[in-house]
Amino acid sequence: VVRAFLLCALAADHLVLRMHRDIRAHSAAVLARYIVFSKAQLQAPREDWQVAACWGADAACALQELFGAIPSTQYGACRGQGFCIVQLDREGCQFECYLEQTSAAALAPRLAQLIQPGAEHQWQALQIASGIARIEAGTSDQFVPQMLNYDVTGHISFNKGCYTGQEVVARLHYKGTPKRRLYLAGIARADITGQPQ
């Protein structure tokens, strides 16, 4: 896996790739090689949209009240003027909200009334607990999709697409068994000191 991203359609002719900041430049260079064969344009990262995570049992109701509509399926999206909401889980408890800066400023007071603020590390912990592995510069090109459980979580399609290493990935999927996979583990003790190795 060289890079992993979420593709979001902010408009019919405006697609955005959400990925870790430290792989943006390399991803743009790789995509630039292929975009010449299409009628699309690759633009530099834009800072006029913000991403907010929203999670919890009441997240769907709060977003419904705020935006009027929400997606109802995993990786489904609902968009409107200045916003796009993507549902990340099957249960409808994890969402990413893409907000144009003007929309974000206008919605901030109402959002603060409906949703309790959380920290980024809480969202990251939830993503880990959900089995979602993100690719950063240090982990790029270190794993095949099966090692990150992308075949189990629906992050890779075996029916369509063309990507680097497709033959190896498909062979492992149809004829082999991965030697390594991600597993979730936890430690009940809170008094452990030191840095992870």
Predicted feature locations:
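Basic, glycine/lysine-rich polyanion-binding surfaces/domains
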Residues: 1-197
